[in-house]
Amino acid sequence: MGEERWVSLTPEEFDQLQKYSEYSSKKIKDALTEFNEGGSLKQYDPHEPISYDVFKLFMRAYLEVDLPQPLSTHLFLAFSQKPRHETSDHPTEGASNSEANSADTNIQNADNATKADEACAPDTESNMAEKQAPAEDQVAATPLEPPVPRSSSSESPVVYLKDVVCYLSLLETGRPQDKLEFMFRLYDSDENGLLDQAEMDCIVNQMLHIAQYLEWDPTELRPILKEMLQGMDYDRDGFVSLQEWVHGGMTTIPLLVLLGMDDSGSKGDGRHAWTMKHFKKPTYCNFCHIMLMGVRKQGLCCTYCKYTVHERCVSRNIPGCVKTYSKAKRSGEVMQHAWVEGNSSVKCDRCHKSIKCYQSVTARHCVWCRMTFHRKCELSTLCDGGELRDHILLPTSICPITRDRPGEKSDGCVSAKGELVMQYKIIPTPGTHPLLVLVNPKSGGRQGERILRKFHYLLNPKQVFNLDNGGPTPGLNFFRDTPDFRVLACGGDGTVGWILDCIDKANFAKHPPVAVLPLGTGNDLARCLRWGGGYEGGSLTKILKDIEQSPLVMLDRWHLEVIPREEVENGDQVPYSIMNNYFSIGVDASIAHRFHVMREKHPEKFNSRMKNKLWYFEFGTSETFAATCKKLHDHIELECDGVGVDLSNIFLEGIAILNIPSMYGGTNLWGENKKNRAVIRESRKGVTDPKELKFCVQDLSDQLLEVVGLEGAMEMGQIYTGLKSAGRRLAQCASVTIRTNKLLPMQVDGEPWMQPCCTIKITHKNQAPMMMGPPQKSSFFSLRRKSRSKD
């Protein structure tokens, strides 16, 4: 039989769909409730085939926005069109999609596309409510082949909601067992607790559909899933129960990786954390020693120890993963190397001769210290942690807590879910500074996910925490009694502020210093701390070595209190009550708010720094002509340290309150001071005299705020592009009070909102220890400029 293929979305469209899913606050289960009584889709039957109009309504309920017309149409066609057939009866295994295209396929695609376009045309409500008869006499599909076509060539295309829901649920984050159970109940339409062969094939076809988008080679996955289906039906009666379905899925590792393996609970119990990977150089299976082949993702690789296997070998009797903690703390216990064989195309650390990638049996490397040796060259069995020993928590430094006193709980505590959570004690190596790594996987697109995997390998997985799993608190509690530990915040400025808030609430006797690995765009705080505007794929080992030598600086943090007037209606929720970077009101907040609203509606248009800059330019240009915040002085009152600032003679459209010398991704609104004329004030008295303000220096640890006026969007653009050095200096003070009498756009640390009439008070809260990045190396041209300025 010829191999059948789905009509697929393009990779760009698939990325679009993923971004819409990530930005939506709803889960697929929430969208299904719209078909219940009182929901927006109550007039439709979810068990019947649905038309394009109902499909659009369902996607709007799920994603909370309307999909772009091309993406919506193509996604609908992906579920309604006939699968494409190979022209040959015996196709080459692993053939590309392009080889499957034929003239008949193109005609069929064009015919269906025309019908979909007709279906996409505005219909009356009666047409939208029209239902198609269910295909009850469907022929049972053979295992692992696409289902029977569900649209006739003479009728408008329709889709089955089950297929759409199953497909979308695979894109969502969540536990694999929950996804398996959800898909089972979704296709168990008669609610008898059993799935027949055709229903299981429909589910597996959707899994293969997703696998192709993730660049998996289905030639390996297809027989594994087929074997899984055969193994589930123990009594060979053609039906599978929920228990059999979940058990079969949870014991098939490639399927777990496809569903999104949850490795949060496997840090140290000997279980591997598998991920599909494409290898850029020849790589061999650690089990069978045969090279991994394929043009897509060729095999499974453990995130923790880099043990690599074929998909077919992963279920064999392979060695367990490295242990990340010691079972019991014994006096005098020493750390031994944890060896992994093969795939080390580097030089031997003893004889300094090259190790070939195929020498899987003759060479191995240590997971902890990264030392690589030929077997004949191995020296001591003792491991000291290697070049990252100052940061890494070796397994001998972590042991479970034991309680010997009567009446106390055993070696763990019960979580909110009723699960037993192990508690640990950290006894670091003397003279070291263990590093707590907190990663926001959503920052920088998928950059955060890659950073998380890399740190899992570079350090002990137990000291690396995913902020999606409970936020910063679990990591801070794990390190609570650890002396001299440091924190690395991987994410944007919002992530850093979140971590600093949690450190405040944790009530540490001594606050740990925080370094920043900036992800995404903006990152004004990271720029001021010399960590750069965004991680661009450099060596993480070098960044960790820089943290070892980082000097400390105290960062001022400010309390932001917004007091609305009693007679006005409630506006948007204030994003933060603490300010770390800046607060602004007026023209720049208006542009930021429009940018924020547009990004929520169309996240796929904001997936690069260049696109973000172009959108800011467009919004800034339109704001220049609209001037929505002109005559700002008529609508606000400004007080600095209790003294009013006269704005009547100044034509401003915006006011910014600065704590750090960076805004809008590196722009300094306060401006630079000549070093020979700058004055660092020791007193905390406010300054509003324009002559004195010329010599006031901005410092993120002086417990002072800088107040700057903006004349409009045009001036903002000039400052951003360097055509103008700074805005208008209004004051330098220790507290600010602003009163407004109309609805105005505001933003704090890059998060905008619309605020009705209110009183805003900004006062000093505390200081947080931060680590500075290494000084930037001066280039030849910067040295020339400095020498000219001295002359």
Curated annotation (Swiss-Prot):
Per the record, where are the segments of Basic and acidic residues compositional bias? Answer: 83-92
Domain named DAGKc is located at 430-564
Which of this chain's residues are annotated to bind Ca(2+) 1? 188, 190, 192, 199
User: What top-tier enzyme class does this entry carry?
Assistant: transferase
Chain ranges of zinc fingers (Phorbol-ester/DAG-type): 271-321, 336-385
Q: Does the keyword Nucleotide-binding apply?
A: yes
The terms under GO molecular function for this entry are:
ATP binding; ATP-dependent diacylglycerol kinase activity; calcium ion binding; lipid binding; zinc ion binding
**Which keywords appear in this protein's UniProt record, sorted alphabetically?**
ATP-binding, Calcium, Cytoplasm, Cytoskeleton, Kinase, Lipid metabolism, Membrane, Metal-binding, Nucleotide-binding, Repeat, Transferase, Zinc, Zinc-finger
This protein's pathway reads:
Lipid metabolism; glycerolipid metabolism
- What GO terms fall under cellular component here? cytoskeleton; cytosol; membrane; plasma membrane
Residue segments, region Disordered:
82-103, 117-154, 768-791
E.C. designation(s): 2.7.1.107
Q: Where is the composition biased (Polar residues)?
A: 94-103
Tell me the ranges covered by the EF-hand domain, including all copies. Answer: 175-210, 220-255
Q: What is its main location?
A: membrane
Similarity comment text for this entry: Belongs to the eukaryotic diacylglycerol kinase family.
Q: What does this protein do?
A: Diacylglycerol kinase that converts diacylglycerol/DAG into phosphatidic acid/phosphatidate/PA and regulates the respective levels of these two bioactive lipids. Thereby, acts as a central switch between the signaling pathways activated by these second messengers with different cellular targets and opposite effects in numerous biological processes. Has no apparent specificity with regard to the acyl compositions of diacylglycerol. Specifically expressed in the cerebellum where it controls the level of diacylglycerol which in turn regulates the activity of protein kinase C gamma.
Q: What is this protein called?
A: Diacylglycerol kinase gamma
Mind giving the lineage of the organism this protein is from? Eukaryota, Metazoa, Chordata, Craniata, Vertebrata
Gene symbol of the encoding locus: DGKG
